[in-house]
């Protein structure tokens, strides 16, 4: 899988000692399981041995579980997929999840990386899921972003 246009190369991270929480939905299980596998691989490659993994039914449940994980973790990864349908439900769910994840991150001063795919169709989600035939791996990218932000915050807080 070659990097998509505009996606930065993730540097190798030494995140040993970082407490990582991952919340992943179960709707569209093939996609969410692949996102989770990508996040776990980045965590392991970065020295995070046992991230806390919590599965929830749908994307709308992600923010409240991310909030709980943020209480005792240094970083959180939120993974899921919302695929556009024929009703405005897509917009409501996407907005609520995105705003919820952002609020949790700011309120807890803990990075919560948004790896929730919001796509027009299932193929777009599959293309981003980190499967062998996928163009991108948003689970890996989200985990890398969360760990990188946690290390940056650790460094900034050590200066205070």
Swiss-Prot record:
Catalyzes the formation of 6,7-dimethyl-8-ribityllumazine by condensation of 5-amino-6-(D-ribitylamino)uracil with 3,4-dihydroxy-2-butanone 4-phosphate. This is the penultimate step in the biosynthesis of riboflavin. InterPro entries: LS, LS/RS, LS/RS_sf. (2S)-2-hydroxy-3-oxobutyl phosphate binds at residues 86-87, 128. It comes from the Bacteria. One of its GO terms (biological process) is riboflavin biosynthetic process. It catalyses: (2S)-2-hydroxy-3-oxobutyl phosphate + 5-amino-6-(D-ribitylamino)uracil = 6,7-dimethyl-8-(1-D-ribityl)lumazine + phosphate + 2 H2O + H(+). This is 6,7-dimethyl-8-ribityllumazine synthase. Pathway: Cofactor biosynthesis; riboflavin biosynthesis; riboflavin from 2-hydroxy-3-oxobutyl phosphate and 5-amino-6-(D-ribitylamino)uracil: step 1/2. Keywords: Riboflavin biosynthesis, Transferase. 5-amino-6-(D-ribitylamino)uracil binds at residues 27, 59-61, 81-83, 114. Its EC number is 2.5.1.78.
């Amino acid at each position: 899988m070659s990097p998509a246009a505009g996606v930065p190369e993730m540097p190798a991270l030494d995140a040993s000692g970082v407490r990582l929480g991952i919340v992943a939905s179960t709707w569209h299980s093939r996609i969410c399981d692949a996102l989770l596998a990508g996040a776990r691989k980045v965590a392991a490659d970065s020295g995070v041995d046992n991230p806390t993994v919590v599965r929830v039914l749908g994307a709308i449940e992600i923010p409240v579980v991310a909030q709980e994980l943020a209480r005792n973790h240094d970083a959180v990864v939120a993974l899921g997929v919302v695929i556009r349908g024929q009703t405005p439900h897509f917009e409501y769910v996407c907005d609520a999840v995105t705003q919820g994840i952002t609020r949790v991150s700011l309120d807890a001063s803990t990075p919560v990386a948004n790896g929730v795919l919001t796509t027009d169709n299932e193929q777009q989600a599959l293309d981003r899921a980190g499967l062998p035939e996928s163009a991108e791996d948003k689970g890996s990218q989200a985990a890398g972003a969360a760990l990188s932000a946690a290390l940056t915050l650790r460094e900034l807080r050590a200066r205070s």
